[in-house]
Amino acid sequence: MFKYNRSLCSSALIAKSQIRFYRLKRAPLNYASHIPEVLNKTIIGPDEPEKCLILKGKTSEEIENNLLSNKKFQEINPLDTIQETFIQYLKFCNETNFKRSNKNLNRLKKTLESKDSNSTVKINAVFNYLLEECDLEIKRLNTTGQTQVYNEEKGNEDDLEQSIMNDIFRSAQEQFEDQEGHIPLRSTSFLLEILKSFNERFNGIIKPKESITEMVTFSQLAQAFEVVKLIPVQEMKEKGIYLVGNLLYGTGKVRLDPINESFYIESLLVFGNYKAAYSLFITNKDKVNERWWNELGLMITLRSNHLRNFRKLLAETDAKYSTKYSYLSPRVTKLSIRKYLSIGNVTEANILTDRFIKLVEEVGIIRMKDEQEELPTGVKNFQNEKHATEFLNELEIPSDHDYISIVDFHLYKRNIPMAAQLISKYMEIPGTTQEDAAFLLVKTKLNMLKDFEKLRNIFAQNKDYVVPENNVKMLQEAFESVITKYNTNSPIYNELLFENVSALTKSIVLTDFLEEFITKQASGQWMELNSVSRSRKFNGLLNILLGTGEEEKAYNILKKLEEASKKSKTDPDLLYNQFYSEVNAYHYAKFVEFYSLQIQNMKAQNTPSFRKKEFKQKVKSLLKRMQESEVIPNAVFLREILNFYDSMYDFNSSFEIINPLLESKQQVSSESSLSTSNPCRFYNRRIITKPLYHKIWSVYCHYYHVLQNNSRILSKKSSIVKKLIKRQIKIHPTCHPRVLFQMTAENGEILPDKTFSKLIVSTFMKSGDLEAIPAILTFLTKKFDLNIDYDLSMYILKGLKRQYLRDISNISKDACEYKLRKAELMNNESILKNIPQGTNQENTISHLIREILIFIKWKEKSDCSTFLMVEDAFKELGTEFTLLEELIEDVNKLKIKA
């Protein structure tokens, strides 16, 4: 074998010739090699070994020198090339050839090319350059506008190489802008990427924690904070403030002044870092000592769902900063009312609403059109901190928008009496005209009632408030003017309008559908609606059709929607440009919901269940159609499909969905959204919604109910049914209820209401994990300010009683022994004591925990129990109960016969 190999390698140029192999044939052959060295030995005998001849060429250094000297090759320094491309990109980011920008760029170029500049100096120079360019970029955008800046940029590309590079950069930039949906603030976007990189490096994500001051100074970071506050795009501004704030506070050496710190706190709230936000507020509360700072704290507690802390801080604020009108910022009022209504605490919501009404009666409101005229066009500048504090402490007058939002909250949470009172009081506000009343009706969608009598009926529901006749008269005139404007007297609308307010507020989707239908369809503006709005209209149409029993017509509509999806995939130009919108998971969810309701109706009426198989087959067919249409299930669809399987006691299908869903949630925990470099907003962090979590807990509760060991003596019929269901269960939950609770309450950022909390407690009781319930109750009351009322307390005590009886039944030989054991247990005055009505929260919690501890001790048949599993549950949830040790000691003193 002969090997011929010649290669040339250098730092800038690599050239490698082909390797050619020559094998001498062993058979006799009249052949002469073209290689001089083997002319005299062309044939190798059979017994002779192969020989390898390596041909020597010029060295790599000789060839490299020859190419550089004679062939006009040029040696390239890779670092210089990267630096040159970087300068070209910065020039592209300048957008236009402004003299000041060019001057800044030339200064930076000199610094980067200087041999005396090390990496730190270069990074420092780049950061300074970007800060100045961002400031200029924002000012240009505010003065010249986006289109003019772009046109000037295109007109100034004289240099061919720069023009080509700009096309490359612009192509990448356009893809980024399409994804982000931002105005092209190129230097600003680049600065945010650098800030993101700094966060990754200096906040312990990539490397161990270091100091940011190794790269940039505090002065530069302070300047960066001022620059990002001016960004006109809200999302970019919030992210910029978040990133710079993390770097400043990450050093542990500096703290912003209260006003600037409030900007950083707001960004922490936006990106879900509630603990850090509250910590900054509470550590500066006494030092700042201003009402506006307390209002900021109130917003933090509300947005982080710490309603108990909200109540405490509100009481403190009222006592410390009392005003003539019991003033509370409209922003705080709106959010607090919405939060309390969402957990079903109507009493607290009504108290806050009454407070809002009194404020409006004293100071009036700002009309929407007037408010728009007075909105500031830019950032407000102050002469000093004193003027800024005075501005922040000014009483904010509520607007029409604030008032109508609160009416909406009460309407759609079915607190009709308070909503009616608000509507009536609105008519009494000085300066209210018929046009203003009509505006309220349209915004609350009350104009979609069939006639005014349906609206008049809501005023009769509030017996504590008598509506003046003048208010009703003005409202009626406004109602009639709206009907005339939208022509809803037409027969086509008559069958579609709502019979009463309850029907109006029952389905927001349906209400939105009718609103869009009335305002757009009649004017011929259907195709001007965006794809989401049209999709919602069809969703509402499906809802109406299925609700009225028109199943076949609903399937015809679904078929059209599926056809629209197929057409848009074949021809992308048709996407969102067809009369029928593309099918999505919401459309399929309506059908599944319809079949679930059918099964529930069959159970309620005790009708034969032979149609269950038919419904299950239809749902299976829907899933197949979804797969064929490549529609990805969303949280709404998953909730409905789980509801359907749950109503069928089909736990196999239920946990086929739940198990992988919870596993993916654990992998993409919302704690990762607290990343300092790439933060996520609320709705992006929460991949499982509150209704879906509620349904998952419902399935768990029913599952453990079926798995409970029923008494051999009691509930024989129930035991037979459970055994039949139990035999069919092949797939079981992989996520423990304790883990599910942590995912729901902590990582899921869910605020459970009373019904949800009762479901959680019920699940733990049915699963037999009574050791966790003391920690669960403590967590719910401490974080979510849940009111453990008399009904919930009795529910827990009755559940404990059932546990006692079930265990007694299982250890009894016959019914006679069971009765004796039951009588002995029930006569024991130490257990299952009722809680007197009116007992305060602390005593109620203590009583319930004590009863649970007694049951655990009774079940363990121990004279002195350590209750380690109870304490472990408290540690798992990161909460504590100060009286736990005292209760344990008290319970261990009791003598309870097992």
From Swiss-Prot:
Where does it mainly reside? mitochondrion
User: Which domain of life, per UniProt?
Assistant: Eukaryota
What biological-process terms (Gene Ontology) are attached? mitochondrial ribosome assembly; mitochondrial translation
Cellular component GO terms, alphabetical: mitochondrion
Enumerate the subcellular locations listed in this protein's record, separating them with semicolons: Mitochondrion
Q: Does this UniProt record's set of keywords contain Mitochondrion? A: yes
Q: What else is known?
A: Present with 396 molecules/cell in log phase SD medium.
Q: Does the keyword Mitochondrion apply?
A: yes
The protein, known as: Protein SOV1, mitochondrial
**Keywords, comma-separated and alphabetical:** Mitochondrion, Transit peptide
**Transit peptide, start-end:** 1-31
Q: Which GO terms describe its molecular function?
A: translation activator activity
